[in-house]
Amino acid sequence: MAIPRSLIVLSLAFVFMINSALATAVTYNVASLGAKANGKTDSTKAFLSAWAKACASVKPVVIYVPAGRFLLRNVVFSGPCKNNAITFRIAGTLVAPSNYRVIGNADNWIFFQHVNGVTISGGILDGKGTALWACKASGKSCPSGATTLGFSNSNNIKVSGLISLNSQMFHIVINGCHNVKMDGVRVSASGNSPNTDGIHVQMSSGVTILNSKIATGDDCVSIGPGTSNLWIENVACGPGHGISIGSLGKDQQEAGVQNVTVKTVTFTGTQNGLRIKSWGRPSTGFARNILFQHAVMINVQNPIVIDQNYCPGKKGCPGQVSGVRISDVTYQDIHGSSSTEVAVKFDCSSKYPCSKIRLENVKLTYKNQVAVATCSHAGGTAAGMVQPTSCL
């Protein structure tokens, strides 16, 4: 007996309604859970309550932070959760305590660990770091400071439209994660703020950083050991210390860095442009298959630099040689101005010289004149127009 067409239509409609209901996200407003938008009342418990509800839900969840300023102490959002779709939709500002000592000895202010499928959309994170920077500048005994936003051992993370202001230490750290996308992120801190790296990536794969503007007192993006398949595109950096691979080789047994692409980036008034840096001591580390492409330098102190003799304070490494092996590094379409005469510097390991370095269509000037390139223990090729003249 044939099933009536109307019954089939009704059945399909019912299935669609059920699926739609399952897919519809549950929303928890932190204000409804006790958070106060006055910037003075501690709202940490309300945020943790929202997270507990979200993490226990089998449906997708939106944690909504309305307009206003919400004071948070250091907070840890831990997984695994029962769903893989939790979104923080932030219309307001999360504010760290004015007394930097409240969170200054915590590794992180806002920390996600063992989560999957977390999205942060919009919002401002105000780390209130200026007083701690002043403490450090005075030479007094100060806490080391907290990273503003940290992700550890987490997968499928998305961060978009987020602003991080005045972090005590690093602004954003991605550690031990896979498949992370950061888009339209803005980082802002004073050019003399200590150790305030914009985005730090280590022991992670499949990280993408797009369409972002970073102004800070340390590296705009720092790339640590164990990073692979990293893509950075359309990023403006300055002030800051540039985009740095390293420091590598701090530990004798260390994971390497490979498959990194940095393209369409602009450096303005930075200490470095494109930098690879390793400690001058033995290590199993490496950096290979690196592409730097389409970069503009505007009054940058060290536009292109490999430094394998990093030894801060001349402690723990004098008289030793870097064991980090650097190979297959390409600089393509790099142009602009250097604020120092040496615009290209390859200072590589005497034991493991840099190999397969390629310069292609590079033009860097110093005071509108020809700049200088220097090489030590570096080998490779040059193609197209290369100024300063290649020393490879």
Feature-to-residue mapping (PLM):
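Extracellular/periplasmic carbohydrate-active domains that bind, remodel
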Residues: 2-392
